[in-house]
């Protein structure tokens, strides 16, 4: 059931809808948080695309064992998303998650390149996906809060760009050595995600942004 009051609903046509998308794209703070989410989703989809081959072919686990690992890692994302609401300011959750993603992505890349054991890989991936989950709730909140006028279109664009990012990134992990390409993909997405967050924070006075984080 539609929850938006009737008097606040838009009655515009298709052309006006696309004009709304144009206005949204020109909102830099909204777009930066959406891009942060898109790059974080890139890490998620890179993991989804590569993990069956890494766990089953490289480490030699059965499909059932892989499904258990996949489920455990999914729990990490859900728990992190729930914990992120405990931060006083959503900027704190996003920045913490982005810094964690970068640090752990570098660790995963180095570990895979050096032929780490399964448990090292699994623990690092659990931690990486946990830090990624911290950004999902907080960044979505920040993005939607910065584009309230066209909230419906903003939500649609956010989802579209995030899944488009996953579709673009997923094939990249299959280029060359999957262990190397997966690690590199993680690091590149994590760097871009952190840069988008830092740039978005500069769209408000830096003193205000830092006060929100450490308050």
Spans of features found by a protein language model:
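A late C-terminal transmembrane helix in Major Facilitator Superfamily
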Residues: 130, 142-178, 185-188
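C-terminal transmembrane helical hairpin of 12-TM major facilitator-type secondary transporters
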Residues: 94-138
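Juxtamembrane intracellular "pre-TM" segments in multi-pass secondary transporters
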Residues: 2-34
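Transmembrane alpha-helices of Major Facilitator/SLC transporters
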Residues: 66-87
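Juxtamembrane helix-start elements in MFS-like secondary transporters
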Residues: 61-70, 121
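Short amphipathic helix-loop junctions that connect adjacent transmembrane helices
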Residues: 49-64
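Helix-loop junctions on the cytosolic side of multi-pass membrane transporters
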Residues: 1-11, 200-210
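Pair of pore-lining "gating" transmembrane helices in MFS-fold secondary transporters
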Residues: 26-44, 126-127
